[in-house]
Amino acid sequence: RFKTGTKVFDWIVPQEWNIKDAYIKDSSGKKILDFKKNLLSIVYYSIPIKKWILKKDLIKKIHFDNKLPNAVPYVTSYYKKAWGFCMSKNRLKKLNKKKYFINIDTNFKKGFLEIGEYFKKGKNKKEIFFSTYICHPSMANDNLSSIAVQLNLIKYLKENYRNSFFSYRFVFLPETIGSICYLSKKKDKLKKNMMLGFALSCLGDDHNYSLIKSRN
């Protein structure tokens, strides 16, 4: 666990962000967007806001994907105070009222960045390292697919290689800032014992894997 405000290399652990609700209502009171029905509907790390807004101003705050007109994009604003919504391009075209009521019920507070780790000790101290990120909501390929694969790898090793030759380390963390936090504590140990590592990401598609050689 890393407290808000902790310096990790030249980064700072940010405040914890929590969301209770977010929606857009038209002038008749009908919800045309509801975070509780689609977790991708909000720009993550949005500041709280609650007000009536003109359509011309609202559409400036709505994110969509031109290439996938029926898809709702995943958008974040971790390093800039902002707010916004996400919806499909085709849904955006159907907005036909002059005014809308928006509500983003969020808060920021001092909290913790948490990392999950599982270590399987082998006969040899040399480690095979696996890492995946857990910060993307409601998306199967990016990145529930990799979380599922990593969990099943742990299960497979426990059931079939109880006395493995190599040691295995599995890490679950928030993307980028989580990796930086982890390395700030474990880099020396990893440099000493890690033989090779796998970063698991988007394993639900048919793309090829990529190989990155060590600078050493």
Q: Which residues does each PLM region occupy?
A:
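N-terminal hydrophobic/helix-forming segments and targeting peptides
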Residues: 1-216
